[in-house]
């Protein structure tokens, strides 16, 4: 083997840090390194069922004294060990490699593969028989080192000759996917639960015999699409070295009598013969729906067969069933009991920390520019699941590629090395990608972060401040609220005359707090079918919880939740009000979800909705006073070609009783009058372009516009609103 070997040390295997994956690095407890005189950069052999070399690096201070060695899935697989197994290590002296020969595990032809593999392996120690995982265009290829010169542990250098054979290496291909625990981010707790349910029974059945209990037989993973349910099943199968049999619902189904059940029996038989095995049933709701709800005979028989196989008279041996679904309530309840699916584990939408971990995984092989801040990206991707974040990273990389495409000669045999070297993914690429990728949970309820800022709203300082405190602060500074042990308000009612800016305020608050925004119009929730309207309300709150932090905005809430028990009241609205009440203040907590409702008829809303714990903050949005009108004019005249005789103060004086929407209409009408004067009949486009340079909106245009656009609020209207507010405050003060 190598010339010189050190003494053997026994350590416990732990998973690698994300940034070390694929680098051939072993991070060791610093105390062990000091004790045995190991230096950073030394080369060691890791001895499990087989032997693999790695470069030593010290682990982080928190690992001191734990006696662990952190190695990635590739090294674990080469050494034939799993997490928490014991391995022996010893220091070796490696020679520089003159030549390394690799063969793929499946037929593949890589253009320029030798140069690519040399770049990847440079500086890494390798040994004959070692498998190397390589990412090419999003696919993982595995190569086996079939020979090295000299033999033993060698280090690949810039001068090493790499030979790539076209014929695949002769080795048994296991039915196990190439996914390791390091490929899963943001699911530490869930992964731990799944591992203790599955790894322990398969690796150490004697523990369960000693306790005199049956090991768990099945685990049901449920959660929204794209959160990583299938990925967890693949990683567990790979890490425990079990035979992996994936089943997708439709493959089982057959129209011929008895054939579907036969297929299921064959799968369980194959699993038993190749034990330890994991059977993975994806989308289990499609093959085991509730029997009372299906009309087809096949589904009922399949459910019955699955029940018998999972908890039948025959012992199943080392076979564990993992099932995944995003509709756990659609599964037959007989499956959801101990002895069949013993544990149900929710695989939820990742929080900010989880999103950062997932982004680290998907960008670990990406050449990122200095200005890319993954912390910031994690902040901006509320409601994104793992699959969305993967799509975001791919889109950003494609954007970077489009940027350099003009410099690349597509016809050339090889792209110049300097072009490849300078290819970097920047913050700008990620920002562009964010515009195109939205959370998948939200594609059906259009969620947008509106592009309205506080400065786009004239006046209303008091309302802005109240909204900031109630919505923006709890979402931006949750730690302060936790320290004070105060729960922020759940709901806010904006009320006031039409056109005063209630909807605009809701949009601005969603944008400024970086929250997702779901806008609900009353009529689209109402349905003539019994139970449908409530279901829509329930679904919407469920989605909002999923993509939290989120602002749900109900416009014209008086049409959706009128007073119950009134004359001519339909039962639909009564049921919708009840559903809204339970969602806002029910047993299930609304975390990071704020409800904002707007109305110009607060007296029509059901009083139960307006008590503390529901829509508890009532903010009156008054018609603008003179100061606010000046600000609104400034906002709407931004960038317009005004003549010198236009005086905004004077315009504000003349628009007493005008709402924000009326003032916008005045500015638009004045602009249209100026355009009408400019464009003459039969004018060509070129002439119009020339004339446009002289376009000015004058005082005369505004005077004309004011004659056309009348205020939508009369003095009586304003007085009526003010009286209404007094009554309203008296009721809810």
From Swiss-Prot:
Family: Belongs to the AAA ATPase family. CDC48 subfamily.
Matches recorded under Gene3D superfamilies: 1.10.8.60, 2.40.40.20, 3.10.330.10, P-loop containing nucleotide triphosphate hydrolases (3.40.50.300)
Name used for this protein in its record: Cell division cycle protein 48 homolog AF_1297
Entry keyword set: ATP-binding, Nucleotide-binding, Repeat
GO cellular component terms, A-Z: cytoplasm; intracellular membrane-bounded organelle
Any one Pfam family match given in the protein's UniProt record, by short name: AAA_lid_3
Source domain of life: Archaea
Binding site residues for ATP: 223-230, 496-503
A GO term for molecular function: ATP binding
UniProt cross-references to SUPFAM superfamilies, sorted A to Z: ADC-like, Cdc48 domain 2-like, P-loop containing nucleoside triphosphate hydrolases
Keyword Signal recorded: no
InterPro entries: AAA+_ATPase, AAA_ATPase_CDC48, AAA_ATPase_domain, AAA_lid_3, Asp_de-COase-like_dom_sf, ATPase_AAA_core, ATPase_AAA_CS, Cdc48_dom2
């Amino acid at each position: 083997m190598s010339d010189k070997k050190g003494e053997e040390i026994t350590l416990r295997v732990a998973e690698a840090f994300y940034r070390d994956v694929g680098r051939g690095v072993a991070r060791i407890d610093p105390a062990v390194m000091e004790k045995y005189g190991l230096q950073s950069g030394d080369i060691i052999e890791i001895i499990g069922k087989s032997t693999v070399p790695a470069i030593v690096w010290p682990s982080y201070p928190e690992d001191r004294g734990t006696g662990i060695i952190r190695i990635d899935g590739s090294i674990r697989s080469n050494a034939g060990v799993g997490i928490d197994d014991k391995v022996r290590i010893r220091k070796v002296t490696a020679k520089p490699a003159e030549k390394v020969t690799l063969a793929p595990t499946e037929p593949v032809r890589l253009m320029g593969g030798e140069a690519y593999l040399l770049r990847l392996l440079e500086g890494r120690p390798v040994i004959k028989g070692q498998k190397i995982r390589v990412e090419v265009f999003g696919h993982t290829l595995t190569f086996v080192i079939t020979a090295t010169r000299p033999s033993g542990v060698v280090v690949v250098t810039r001068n090493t000759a790499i030979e790539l054979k076209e014929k695949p290496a002769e080795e048994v291909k296991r039915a196990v996917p190439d996914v390791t625990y390091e490929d899963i981010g943001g699911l530490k707790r869930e992964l731990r639960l799944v591992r203790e349910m599955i790894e322990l029974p398969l690796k150490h059945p004697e523990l369960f015999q000693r306790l005199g209990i049956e090991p768990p037989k099945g685990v049901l993973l449920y959660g929204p699409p794209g959160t990583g349910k299938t990925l967890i099943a693949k990683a567990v199968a790979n890490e425990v070295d079990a035979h992996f049999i994936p089943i997708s619902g439709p493959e089982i189904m057959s129209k011929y009598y008895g054939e579907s059940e036969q297929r299921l029996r064959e799968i369980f038989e194959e699993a038993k013969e190749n034990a330890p095995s994991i059977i993975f049933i994806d989308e289990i709701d499609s093959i085991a729906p509730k029997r009372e709800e299906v009309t087809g005979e096949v589904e009922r028989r399949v459910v019955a067969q699955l029940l018998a196989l999972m908890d039948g008279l025959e012992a199943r041996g080392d076979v564990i069933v993992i099932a995944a679904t995003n509709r756990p309530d659609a599964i037959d309840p007989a499956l959801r009991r101990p002895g069949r699916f013993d544990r149900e584990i929710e695989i939820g939408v990742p929080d900010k920390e989880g999103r950062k971990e997932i982004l680290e995984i998907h960008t670990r092989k990406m050449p990122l520019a200095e200005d890319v801040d993954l912390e910031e990206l994690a902040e901006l991707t509320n409601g994104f699941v793992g699959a969305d974040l993967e799509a975001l990273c791919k889109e950003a990389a494609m954007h970077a590629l489009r940027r350099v495409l003009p410099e690349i000669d597509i016809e050339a045999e090889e792209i110049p090395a300097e072009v490849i070297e300078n290819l970097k993914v920047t913050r700008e690429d990620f920002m562009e990608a964010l515009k195109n990728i939205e959370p998948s949970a939200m594609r059906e309820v259009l969620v947008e972060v509106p592009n309205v800022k506080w400065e786009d709203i004239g006046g209303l300082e008091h309302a802005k401040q109240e909204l900031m405190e109630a919505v923006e602060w709890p979402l931006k500074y949750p730690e302060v609220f936790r320290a004070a042990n105060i729960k922020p308000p759940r709901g806010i009612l904006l009320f006031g005359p039409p056109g005063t800016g209630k909807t605009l305020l809701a949009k601005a608050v969603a944008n400024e707090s970086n929250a997702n925004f779901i806008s609900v119009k009353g009529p689209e929730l109402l349905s003539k079918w019994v139970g449908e309207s409530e279901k829509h309300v329930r679904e919407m709150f469920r989605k909002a919880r999923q993509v939290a932090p989120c602002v749900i905005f109900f416009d014209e809430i008086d049409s959706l939740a009128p007073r119950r028990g009134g004359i001519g009241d339909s039962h639909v609205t009564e049921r919708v009000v009840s559903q809204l009440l339970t969602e806002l203040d029910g047993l299930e907590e609304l975390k990071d979800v704020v409800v904002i409702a707007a109305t110009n008829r607060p007296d029509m809303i059901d009083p139960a909705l307006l008590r503390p714990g529901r829509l508890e903050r009532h903010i009156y949005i008054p018609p603008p006073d003179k100061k606010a009108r000046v600000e609104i004019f400034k906002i709407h005249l931004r960038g317009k070609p005004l003549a010198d005789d236009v005086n905004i103060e004077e315009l504000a004086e003349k628009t007493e009783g005008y709402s924000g929407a009326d003032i916008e209409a005045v500015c638009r009408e004045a602009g249209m009058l100026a355009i009408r004067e400019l464009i003459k009949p039969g004018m060509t486009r070129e002439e119009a372009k020339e004339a446009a340079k002289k376009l000015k909106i004058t005082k005369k245009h505004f005077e004309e516009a004011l004659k056309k656009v009348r205020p939508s609020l009369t003095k009586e209207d304003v007085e009526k609103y003010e009286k209404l507010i007094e009554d309203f405050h008296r009721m809810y003060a």
